């Protein structure tokens, strides 16, 4: 499968797509930089993502000899071929009608079977990727670059938003959002992280323009709905983790808009209650869609199962253990400090067992030093 997923044409077309997309980015930068000097970072950030997408492809093709991004593209090819054979079935599958009848059409067309068919979250990436098969000329690296290109819009919006909220820190935000190696590496390939990170950025941007500084409401409501839908469809726990933070953000700005301290004290509790009510309403509305993350008990159980899976012997030294989870809220809270440390700053240098992990450890060491400095 690895040998069939790419040809010499991939490496011939990659520079062509790189140049075309970069020139398009330079064109956008040239048009908008006069109105917003922050666009001076636009083309460079795009170039970083495009190069990262190529690097990710090479690493998964030649170092790991496989990976989800290859599986997603492989399955998306089947879906794209179905477009020419039976457009009705293709569009049904595109809108997530993964029925036995539709699968049988793939089988009877010698396209059996797309991977991840039974995994709704993973198959969402396959469905999205199928839209890029024709524009990429059925080219793995080119499709990855198009994925990176489309995802960049939300990321750059987050960069603009943070600079609006905290002016004078554009270089630091550029490093953190546009140039950080792990961010562009895992956010520039045909992967769940590419879509969910971009959606999280778009959701942050749209919430700001809906609730905090209302602007172009129809467009931003549509963006918020689409971003939320994709987050829930791919990684619902991100939406669950995002919701409290967004609620606090909205409540904080609403309270701070009240200039009189006395009125702020009087009205503040009502705004807080309204915010909690809104978060509760949204959580209950999406409860069924959140599945294993639709309640605290389900989320804890999912965390225990995932943790036990990731510490299996099959992973060897490529994982680290934060200790036993007993499935209780108290037990989860007791692991909070070590889990945060592991999530933000591991692997440490002494955890590295291969070149890729060493690169990640070097970046994490830099982040830890910056954290301690601040």
PLM segments and residue spans:
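Extracytoplasmic catalytic/substrate-binding loops of multi-pass membrane glycan-assembly enzymes
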Residues: 60-75, 84-107, 116-128, 333-337, ...
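Membrane-interface alpha helices of multi-pass inner-membrane proteins
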Residues: 184-185, 219-242
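Transmembrane-helix motifs of polytopic, lipid-linked glycan transferases
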Residues: 20-28, 131, 142-165, 369-373
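Juxtamembrane segments of multi-pass membrane glycosylation machinery
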Residues: 2, 103-146, 345-355
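Alpha-helical transmembrane segments and terminal signal-anchor/GPI-anchor hydrophobic tails
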Residues: 232-362
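Membrane-interface transmembrane helices that cradle and orient dolichyl/undecaprenyl
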Residues: 166, 203-219
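Membrane-interface anchor segments at the N-terminal boundary of transmembrane helices
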Residues: 1-16, 269, 346-374
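Short acidic/glycine- and proline-prone juxtamembrane loop motifs at membrane-interface regions
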Residues: 189-196
């Amino acid at each position: 499968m690895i040998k069939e997923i790419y040809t010499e044409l991939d490496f011939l077309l990659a520079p062509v797509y790189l140049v075309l997309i970069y020139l398009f980015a330079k064109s956008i930068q040239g048009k908008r930089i006069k109105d917003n000097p922050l666009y001076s970072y636009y083309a460079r950030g795009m170039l970083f993502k495009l190069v990262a997408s190529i690097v990710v492809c090479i690493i998964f093709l030649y170092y790991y000899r496989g990976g989800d991004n290859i599986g997603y593209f492989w399955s998306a090819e089947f879906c794209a071929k179905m477009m020419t054979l039976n457009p009705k079935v293709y569009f049904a599958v595109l809108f997530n009608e993964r029925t036995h009848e539709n699968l049988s059409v793939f089988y009877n067309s010698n396209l059996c079977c797309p991977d991840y068919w039974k995994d709704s979250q993973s198959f969402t990436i396959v469905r999205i990727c199928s839209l890029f098969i024709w524009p990429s000329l059925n080219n793995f690296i080119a499709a990855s670059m198009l994925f990176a290109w489309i995802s960049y819009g939300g990321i750059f919006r987050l960069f603009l938003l943070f600079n609006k909220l905290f002016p004078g820190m554009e270089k630091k935000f550029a490093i953190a959002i546009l140039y950080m190696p792990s961010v562009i590496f895992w956010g520039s390939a045909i992967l769940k992280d590419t879509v969910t990170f971009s959606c999280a950025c778009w959701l942050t941007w749209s919430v700001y323009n809906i609730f905090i500084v209302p602007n172009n409401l129809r467009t931003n409501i549509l963006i918020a709905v689409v971003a939320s839908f994709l987050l829930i469809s791919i990684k619902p726990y991100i939406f669950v983790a995002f919701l409290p933070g967004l609620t606090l953000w909205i409540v904080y700005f609403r309270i701070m808009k009240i200039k009189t301290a006395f009125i702020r004290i009087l009205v503040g509790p009502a705004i807080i209650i309204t915010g909690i009510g809104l978060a509760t309403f949204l959580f209950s509305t999406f409860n069924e869609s959140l599945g294993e993350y639709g309640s605290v008990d389900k989320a804890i159980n999912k965390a225990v199962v995932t943790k036990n899976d990731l510490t299996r012997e099959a992973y060897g030294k490529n994982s680290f253990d934060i200790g036993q989870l007993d499935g209780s809220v108290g037990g989860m809270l007791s692991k909070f400090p070590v889990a945060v440390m592991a999530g933000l700053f591991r692997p440490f240098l002494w955890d590295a067992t291969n070149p890729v992990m060493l690169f990640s450890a070097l970046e994490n060491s830099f982040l830890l030093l910056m954290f301690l400095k601040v």
